[in-house]
A protein has these predicted regions:
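Coiled-coil dimerization/phosphotransfer module
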Residues: 1-174
Length: 174
């Protein structure tokens, strides 16, 4: 994009090759539109629209409804947490339910989100086979990084035979 615009600028300054300059500006315009689309998709991935528009309970209700196994969801928050905490809670649940559906052979999952003092607690438990581990390049490792980014903690308990529980504690002020 920058190279195309730089070349177009040079050609305009020299006054030569108007057709080529128009083509370069057109290419730069197309690249800019693609970049904007990519950024919008990235932002949605960071903070989904339903989360921003309707809050954590509605966003997670939608996630639970799409999960291939039954999910018992309880969100007990007296007020909306700060946006980074809300987004982190959302991604903890979505990653956990993805893992439950893919790996656990569970018949059901339970999600509990509550406020305990200055912390939002997110707990996802399944009745599957257990044995889950955090792998260095896996989704849970990335999730642990996301939780640490808001100064939270993430713990996994998954004994062989189950159940598996993922617990995130996310600070959100007093």
């Amino acid at each position: 994009l920058a190279m195309d615009l730089g070349l177009a600028k040079e050609r305009l300054e020299r006054g030569d090759d108007p057709a080529g300059t128009v083509m370069l500006v057109g290419q730069a315009h197309d690249e800019a539109k693609r970049a904007i689309t990519d950024l919008r998709e990235l932002v949605r991935g960071i903070h989904p629209a339903v989360l921003a528009d309707r809050g954590l309970d509605a966003a997670l209700s939608s996630v639970a409804a799409r999960c291939p196994i039954p999910v018992d969801l309880q969100v007990d928050l007296p007020e909306r947490p700060p946006a980074p905490v809300e987004a982190t809670a959302y991604f903890v649940v979505t990653e956990a339910l993805t893992n439950v559906a893919k790996h656990s052979r569970a018949r059901g999952a339970r999600v509990r989100i509550s406020r305990r003092g200055p912390m939002v607690t997110v707990e996802v438990t399944d009745d599957g086979v257990g044995g889950a581990v955090v792998q260095e390049a896996g989704g849970l490792a990335g999730l642990a990084d996301r939780v640490r980014a808001v100064e939270g903690t993430l713990r996994l308990a998954s004994p062989p035979g189950g159940p598996t529980t993922l617990l995130a504690e996310l600070p959100c002020g007093s």
